[in-house]
Swiss-Prot record:
Name assigned to this protein: Glutamyl-tRNA(Gln) amidotransferase subunit C
Subunit details: Heterotrimer of A, B and C subunits.
Alphabetic keyword roster: ATP-binding, Ligase, Nucleotide-binding, Protein biosynthesis
Transmembrane residue ranges: none
UniProt record similarity statement: Belongs to the GatC family.
GO biological process, one term: translation
Signal peptide region: none
Gene, per the UniProt record: gatC
Any GO MF annotation of the entry: glutaminyl-tRNA synthase (glutamine-hydrolyzing) activity
InterPro entries: Asp/Glu-ADT_sf_sub_c, GatC
Protein species of origin: Saccharolobus solfataricus (strain ATCC 35092 / DSM 1617 / JCM 11322 / P2)
Function: Allows the formation of correctly charged Asn-tRNA(Asn) or Gln-tRNA(Gln) through the transamidation of misacylated Asp-tRNA(Asn) or Glu-tRNA(Gln) in organisms which lack either or both of asparaginyl-tRNA or glutaminyl-tRNA synthetases. The reaction takes place in the presence of glutamine and ATP through an activated phospho-Asp-tRNA(Asn) or phospho-Glu-tRNA(Gln).
């Protein structure tokens, strides 16, 4: 199925996404979207008949077993902290002074 990227498609996508683009942004999006679709069309042209489908590209996951461990004690947790006060980490203010 060939998708035609034109002004109508861009306007339709604008309406679906509830955004408003300037004329310049519409032209940029139209060009970028056309390039993306061309790329996927090239991928679709590949002959993959001799390629066995994979469920996952890695033979097994990299997850470790969820084994309970002793937590860090306060002294080790605060050892490399720049600012601490009364046994707590002092972070930067995020609101007000």
């Amino acid at each position: 199925m060939k998708i035609e990227v034109n002004e109508n498609l861009i306007k339709h996508l604008e309406n679906l996404s509830l955004i408003q683009l300037s004329g310049e942004e519409e032209k940029i999006l139209e060009k970028d979207l056309a390039n993306i679709i061309k790329f996927f069309e090239k991928i679709n042209e590949l002959d993959l008949s001799n390629v066995e489908p994979l469920f996952h590209p890695l033979p097994q996951g990299r997850l470790r077993k969820d084994v309970p461990r002793d937590p860090l004690d306060r002294e080790n947790a605060l050892k490399n902290v720049k600012r601490k006060e009364d046994g707590y980490i002092v972070g930067p203010r995020t609101y007000g002074e």
